Design a protein with these regions (language model features):
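Intrinsically disordered, low-complexity acidic Ser/Thr-rich regulatory segments
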Residues: 339-343, 501-546, 550
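N-terminal pre-domain segments of enzymes
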Residues: 29-81
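Active-site beta-strand/loop architecture of penicillin-binding DD-peptidases
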Residues: 369-372, 540-556, 561-564
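N-terminal secretory signal peptides that target proteins for export/translocation
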Residues: 1-3
Length: 648
């Protein structure tokens, strides 16, 4: 079942009666080719000042493993067919080429396809074109951009400040590069759990620093994210809805409790004495405006944060009330399920925990990530909620759940290979189901669920419509700031800190950034992929209004509608930019001579399909009534439809 297509009355009702659009300088935009009165488009800005670029090397999927992936996809379909028969479910028809190409671009690349990509795919008669397109999308930059947004929501990635005066950019960059190089998921997670050092020296340490000073909460978050299990209630008392006891929670937390995240200013590493106080005293001599901290805290405090083993031992709380322990009793590390973790002499218990959690023998590690990614593609997990597995949790299809878990292990936690398998199933390639599944409802996956795009997918789709090369812009690499912020407090001086601070604030760096961003800027908005914008964006930004999370809690992004979203779509700068003369949409439309061809470009660009006869007639009527302005009205109408905003 497809989303209802735009009716004649809906198109006319949505169409504006004003001009095609007006630039901020008041120049009317005209679509007529060859019109001698058309003003030349404004000159492009000068190229930006050269600044360091982050090298992007995207690891492609291997063509040699495609046959096995297709065989696994067929196995998935066989298990689903048996489930359909068991529950007397009729699967949805196969999605049209137009529906499939739009869906797979959104799911894997995080954006709608261009109209040329739609046309090429639909016109292609190759029987393997779907499998080849899946491989292509998994091998391009859009994949890492898309799944960076996914992990940013789960890992609560923040560019600006990870924790007290510690920037998150190196950690965010490490996550992105892990996706680009297709680092196996078990290695990705192990790298975060076992990391040591400052975020500048070992960016993966950002995971532990994210919950600095909260070791018990950190354990709860880790088990929830990577093992799909919520044990947080047992932090204060025996879990009321699961089998975990408070003591078991503390035994798990004992693995990582001896991990420090901040050195004391008087740490022996700094040679004795309070190094921060000493530097602050010296700063008063160097900078007469020094007020004790402020902008200098990113040097003085930020460089105290370092993941290290401090040997601290965890004890039960002072008010512990159960018979299996005593208040303030020392707790030894012990796993709550699966095989025990082997703590070797002389090795941090945290390393044993990291090995145990990421082991293929861990009963919930592979199951959790396979279930999470299934939900990413189908709109619902085989087990719901995906982060609250219990011993008695019943998968919708136990045999399929077990097979997908085993496949994750077989492909050695290669997430691209796993996604390749699922996307090649007949089940994924069926029409979407327009059903609202609430907790407790049975859903047997006759097709993927119809769902609204994420905030990042909406934003990136607008960028694809407006910008010629949406993946071209890369965020400034972390090393630009690293060479200035990363200092050894034991060896530095107030003068060095002062000079580094001056350089960070210098007009040269500011001008370089402004020049770099200028070609991608429009009315205060940076027109680049969401993954290349600061994360998260401020509350008033388009992304936040469409549900991007504030990165304060795990997975709190939203696809719910709101009045601010309607206002953004009706009259926001992101909508107006589509009608600017340098917009890719305008260029593509004006490249066609006939109004009929132009209408097809508009529909295929925005909805990835040609207009119906009724829609074509409505569009022609609008253009006839308002001349060239009518084309802009049609564009405006289509981006304001549910069909544009939903993944079907």
């Amino acid at each position: 079942m497809a989303v209802r297509q735009l009716s004649l009355s809906a198109l006319v009702a949505l169409a504006l009666v004003g001009d095609w659009g007006v630039t901020e300088h008041g120049t009317a935009m005209v679509l007529a080719q060859g019109n001698k009165n058309v003003k030349a488009p404004p000159k492009k800005p000068e190229p930006p000042v050269p600044v360091p670029e982050r090298k992007v090397h995207v690891t492609a999927v291997s063509t040699s493993t495609r046959p096995r992936a297709l065989a696994s996809a067929a196995k998935v379909d066989g298990l689903m067919d048996a489930n359909y028969k068991k529950f007397k479910v009729t699967p949805n028809p196969t999605a049209s080429d137009e529906q499939f190409v739009r869906r797979v671009y959104l799911d894997l690349a995080g954006t709608i396809p261009t109209y040329k990509q739609v046309r090429l795919f639909v016109a292609n008669s190759d029987t393997e074109k779907k499998a080849k397109l899946i491989d292509l999308l998994l091998s391009q930059e859009g994949y890492s951009s898309n799944f960076y947004n996914y992990w940013a929501d789960i890992l609560r990635l923040k560019d600006n400040q990870l924790t007290n005066n510690v920037p998150g950019k190196p950690y965010c960059e490490w996550v992105k590069e892990s996706l680009e190089t297709n680092k196996p998921y078990d290695q990705f997670v192990y790298g975060m759990l076992s990391a040591e050092g400052k975020v500048w020296d070992n960016p993966a340490s950002g995971y532990i620093l994210r919950d600095s000073g909260m070791p018990l909460d950190a354990m709860n978050n880790t088990v929830r994210i990577f093992l799909g299990t919520q044990i947080g209630c047992a932090q204060c008392h025996n879990h009321p809805f699961d089998r975990w006891t408070q003591k078991e929670f503390y035994e798990m937390a004992a693995f990582t409790f001896g991990t420090g995240t901040r050195r004391g200013a008087g740490d022996k590493k700094f040679g004795g004495g309070n190094v921060v106080n000493k530097l602050r005293d010296d700063m008063k001599k160097v900078d007469e405006k020094f007020d004790g901290g402020g902008k200098y805290n990113r040097f003085l405090i930020g460089n105290l944060f370092e993941v290290h083993d401090n040997g601290a031992k965890l004890v039960l709380p002072h008010d512990y009330q159960y018979d299996d322990g005593k208040p303030k009793q020392s707790v030894s590390p012990k796993t709550i399920f699966g095989p025990p973790a082997k703590v070797e002499k002389g090795v941090s218990p945290r390393i044993a925990f990291a090995k145990w959690l990421t082991s293929p023998d861990n009963p919930r590690f592979a199951k959790t990530i396979s279930n999470r990614l299934w939900k990413r593609l189908f709109g619902a997990g085989l087990i719901e909620p995906v982060d609250d597995l219990k011993d008695d949790s019943q998968p919708e299809n136990p045999e399929l759940t077990d097979f997908l878990t085993s496949e994750m292990v077989r492909v050695k936690f290669d997430l691209k290979e796993y996604l390749r398998i699922v996307c090649n199933t007949k089940a994924y390639q069926r029409e979407a189901t327009q059903a609202e599944v609430t907790p407790g409802d049975e859903f047997h996956f006759p097709g993927p669920l119809l769902r609204r795009m994420t905030a990042e997918q909406v934003w990136d789709s607008f960028i694809t419509l407006a910008v010629t090369k949406p993946d071209e812009y890369q965020k400034e690499p972390a090393r630009v700031e690293a060479k200035l912020l990363n200092i050894d407090l034991a060896k530095t001086s107030a003068q060095v800190i002062y000079e580094h601070n001056q350089e960070l604030a210098s007009s040269d760096i500011k001008k370089s950034r402004e020049a770099r961003n200028k070609p991608y800027s429009y009315k205060g908005q940076l027109l680049v992929r969401a993954s290349e914008l600061p994360s998260p964006q401020p509350p008033g930004h388009f992304l936040r209004q469409f549900g991007q999370s504030d990165r304060e809690a795990i997975e709190v992004s939203s696809e719910d509608g709101s009045v601010p979203q309607v206002l953004q779509m009706f009259n926001g700068p992101i909508t107006h930019m589509l009608l600017e003369p340098e917009s890719l949409m305008v260029k593509n439309v004006t490249s066609e001579k006939s109004s009929d061809a132009r209408i097809e470009v508009i529909f295929q660009s925005i909805l990835a399909r040609k207009p119906t006869a009724a829609e074509r007639q409505a569009a022609q009527s609008e253009i006839k009534a308002h001349s060239d302005a009518g084309f802009g009205n049609v564009i405006w109408a289509l981006v304001n439809t549910r069909e544009f905003l939903f993944v079907q």
